[in-house]
Each structure stands twice: as C-alpha cells, then as structure tokens.
Amino acid sequence: MSETILSIENLRIHFETFAGEVQAIRGVNLKLEKGETLALVGESGSGKSVTAKSVMKLLSNNAVVKEGSITFKGENILEKSERDMQSIRGKEIAMVFQDPMTSLDPTMKIGKQITEVIIKHEKASKEEANKRAEELLELVGIPNAKERMKQYPHQFSGGQRQRIVIAIALACNPDVLIADEPTTALDVTIQAQILELLKKLQQQFQMAIIFITHDLGVVANVADRVAVMYAGKVVEVGTVDEVFYNPQHPYTWGLLRSMPTLHTGDTLYAIPGSPPDLLDPPVGDAFALRSDVALEIDRVKEPPMFEVSPTHFAATWLLDPRAPKVPVPEEIVRRRNIFFGEGGQAHD
C-alpha cells in the first residue's frame, strides 16, 4: 500500500498588492506518495510555483495563507517556525530551481557550495563533507570531481551547473525533491540528460518528486501522476496515462491539443483568450470564458471534483450525469481510442 508523505488540503494563498488581493491559490488539494513523481502542469500564473514554494515556506512577505494545511510526515508545515524550517529545507525537502546560474553563488567555489549544506545539516567534518561532495559530483555526471570542486559556476556549462544544483539538493538524502522547471533554460539534448539523471537518482535515493513544468512532453517522460492547474486550482488529476489519453477537463484538452505531434496539421492549436485576473476571479468555472464547450452552469456555479476512476478526478460539469453531450476535439478522440482501444467508450 502506498504511503502519503506530503498532503496539501484546501490551501488558499493571497498576495497583497497595491491593486488589491491576488487570489493566487484558491483551494488546492494534493497528495504526494512516497517514491512517486507528481507533475504540476499549467500555463504561467496557474499557481504551480506558488504551491511548491509554500511547501518550503519560501513565499514573499506579501503572501498570506488564508486557509488550509500542508502536512509533511504528520506535521503541518504552515505552523512551523522559520528556525524549524531551516532544519527541514535542504535536509528533508530540497528544491531545484529553473535557472542554475541564479541558484549558485558566482563568487564561491562549487565545492564549498555543496559542502556547506552537508556540514550544516549532517554535522559532518570538513574532510567528510569534501568526500561526500566528490561522490555527489561523480553521481550527477561531473568528471574529475576533485579538481572541479575548486572551480566557480561560470566555468561550467548550463547543463553542468544544473547537475551541480541537483547534487546540492541531494546532499542530505531528502525525502521530497521539488523541481521547478529544472530544464527550461537548457537545450533539448541536455534537457533529456537531466531528466534521465533525475529518474535514475530518484530510484537510487527512493525520494518523491514534485515536478513543475508547462511542457507536457517532459511530463510524459518523468511523471507517475499529473495535476493540471488553472487559475489557482487543480482542475484535473490522474495517472499520466489517464490525463494524457483520457483527459476530461476542457482545459486539459486545450493543453494537449496545443502540443505538436505527428498527427498535427498545418496550424497548431492555441487556447483562445487569456487566464482570468485573480484580483477578481470569475464566478463558476474559471475556464468557462475560454471554452467553446462551456455550459450555462459553468458561469454561475463552480464544479466539484468528479471521480472518473479511483485515481482520476476532474472539476468539470461535463462529467455530471445530467450534462449534455458536447463535441470532443479530434485530437482528444484519437488519444481516447489509444487509451480504450478502437471503438472503446469514453465520456463525452
């Protein structure tokens, strides 16, 4: 039986700005199982990074947690003091950020940047920390580790810098690794290498990963489960196969249709319109204004999470037994035929 290591319940986070309160996170519920990879996907501004940073308590000073809990190993992180969090960050929960150059101190040799984490959290001697740092660099694929520990970040390529950041994150064998778009700043070849490295290290360290990205192609390669976020909410969650091949929410349809595939015609689909202003979120389903299959109820009442399967849920009124049939995009029908087999039945 799987073991839940991290649980987010009814999380609501607002940001106080001169223009008013931005409702960035509007009731997020998520669970992370031990050893699994959960991908958070969605457009910019959907709440992916804010959700992840709230787990580390790394939100800016104008952030206000209005409601909810984040339970890690049976304790609510939101009730922890900054001193308590300093012993959790880097040791039990680690994070890899998008741009490796801004994650590393340009004035400090990379060896010291790795060893200071080990010395702080593991209470190791300098010699023990240096030995561990060498092992970590070799583990993440940096050759001549002993010599390269004496070099500065600018002496490494972008891909190598990201490997170093991963080495720092893994220095204390964390239970959870949060990877916030860790391959966005890298070219496609290096991106594939970093993803393969993360998969290998996950098996070796038996850690759970929250993988944040807007690239669905990346998700297919790394995730066990996927949570689709829109306007500060999770609108669909399921296994990677369920979300990719039997998607239920119109927003998930739009994301998948906008992915180039071998079946893509001359024009690539783009979701019409823009995400809503979270200073004043719309009533009902926030995606209704951009959806060509929106129902009348979408504009007045927010949909609950409907169960598609024991592992698959989606917040769309289209799943209500009373909902009318709506036309399903050709690309989604093609994916469902793969999921169910030709002629198989899926919800319309």
Give each language-model segment a name.
Residues 2-5, 14-27, 58-64, 80-84, ...:
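A short, flexible loop at the N-terminus of ABC-type nucleotide-binding domains that lies
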Residues 4, 143, 239-344:
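Short catalytic/signature loops enriched in Gly
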Residues 65-76:
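Conserved ABC transporter NBD signature motif
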Residues 76, 128-147, 256:
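Conserved ABC ATPase "signature" region
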Residues 77-94, 120, 242-247, 277-282:
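ABC ATPase NBD coupling module
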Residues 171-175:
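A short, proline-enriched helix->beta-strand linker immediately N-terminal to the Walker B motif
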